[in-house]
Curated annotation (Swiss-Prot):
UniProt entry keywords in alphabetical sequence: Isoprene biosynthesis, Lyase, Metal-binding
Function: Involved in the biosynthesis of isopentenyl diphosphate (IPP) and dimethylallyl diphosphate (DMAPP), two major building blocks of isoprenoid compounds. Catalyzes the conversion of 4-diphosphocytidyl-2-C-methyl-D-erythritol 2-phosphate (CDP-ME2P) to 2-C-methyl-D-erythritol 2,4-cyclodiphosphate (ME-CPP) with a corresponding release of cytidine 5-monophosphate (CMP).
Annotated site residues (Transition state stabilizer) in this chain: 35, 134
Protein name: 2-C-methyl-D-erythritol 2,4-cyclodiphosphate synthase
Phylogenetic lineage: Bacteria, Pseudomonadati, Thermodesulfobacteriota, Desulfuromonadia, Desulfuromonadales
InterPro entries: MECDP_synthase, MECDP_synthase_CS, MECDP_synthase_sf
Amino acid sequence: MMRIGHGYDVHQLVAERKLILGGVDIPHTLGLLGHSDADVLLHAICDAILGALGEGDIGKHFPDTDPAYKGISSIKLLHEVMRLAETKGYRLGNLDATIIAQRPKLAPFIGNMRENIAEACGTDVSRINVKATTTEQLGFEGRGEGISSHAVVLLNKAAHSEER
């Protein structure tokens, strides 16, 4: 059995915060505001996986009202989400994600993002695709006010597991 999930996240860009995308610290004058490290890419991926599992969203599993998640690395959250998928008998088939940001240019960091995501998901990097685009200066991303991300995942039921 295969299951598909879609995730979306957005965070505001602010001064005095690190810009972390796909678990990579990106040099930039602004960073993303959030309770955790505010990694919009990994948050969208977590939501996509949770959606495919029918398990709600990242806010349900890691609420921003819980001090345990204050400043937490989103790589840790992705590990936890994948652990849940595995307990339900699912493995990642493939993942396709898009980061929407006017700046900074993200192409030099995509390879490291893919490697981080593959490691967190326990899969080969060939199953992970990450791309970045701009909005041609339109909307909040185009004005440099924030960054958003979309992710789509395909989960495959492991051959030896039963539907739970």
